[in-house]
């Protein structure tokens, strides 16, 4: 598929996500990377996602993180990259196989809290072992699957640095991360897979946050990961990130 066609597809997804309430206002951004090129395309800053077109995407050099000219599509004059461009860049720099990144601000992703901080900016928590995990290619029975949640630094570059370091050192279980009180970044080999992963992620987060309202014991059901031992974490991740029970706003 040509670059123009891929950008048109991202524009369609932007309108769909805006309608779903995943990209309210001008929040969020979408990107693709072409394997044979040295950069990636990302939606510009301050744009209504229901009105995107192929000229609303900037071509960004992967190494420098700066916008550069492209022979494929000429971006709208004066278009600027979002600060969150660095999040997409972090994923592409860490994971060679990724060809699409979707950064959205869903309500459910903002309700999940792991009490991260500047001193402990990454926590891990366990996802529920439900059927939809198969969308990520996880087929084990009752798998132990963890997702990173990252502190919402005021400077987005600090978020990106944290994410890139994590992805490079510890192979993620699932193709997404949560930025606390901010949103989620989801990725895939192309826009089709990334969109599929985002739909699965949205379902999982809706399921998780529903536990606060529906309980079989009379108390809100929260993620029970406090029993994950330090040794278990070292075996799975070889890393000393804290594992917290998730709480909900």
Curated annotation (Swiss-Prot):
Q: Which cofactor does it need?
A: Zn(2+)
Textual note on the cofactor: Binds 1 zinc ion per subunit.
What EC number(s) are associated with this protein in UniProt?
Answer: 4.2.1.109
Q: Keywords in UniProt for this one?
A: Amino-acid biosynthesis, Lyase, Metal-binding, Methionine biosynthesis, Zinc
A Gene Ontology CC term for this entry? cytoplasm
Q: Which GO terms describe its molecular function?
A: methylthioribulose 1-phosphate dehydratase activity; zinc ion binding
Q: Which residues form the signal peptide?
A: none
Against Pfam families, the record matches this protein to: Aldolase_II (PF00596)
What does the entry list as the binding residues for Zn(2+)?
103, 105
Gene Ontology biological process: L-methionine salvage from methylthioadenosine
UniProt keyword Amino-acid biosynthesis, yes or no: yes
Pathway(s) annotated for this protein in UniProt: Amino-acid biosynthesis; L-methionine biosynthesis via salvage pathway; L-methionine from S-methyl-5-thio-alpha-D-ribose 1-phosphate: step 2/6
Query: Which HAMAP family did the record assign?
Result: Salvage_MtnB
Name the protein family.
Belongs to the aldolase class II family. MtnB subfamily.
Q: What does this protein do?
A: Catalyzes the dehydration of methylthioribulose-1-phosphate (MTRu-1-P) into 2,3-diketo-5-methylthiopentyl-1-phosphate (DK-MTP-1-P).
Q: What is the protein name given in its UniProt record?
A: Methylthioribulose-1-phosphate dehydratase
**Organism, scientific name:** Leptospira interrogans serogroup Icterohaemorrhagiae serovar copenhageni (strain Fiocruz L1-130)
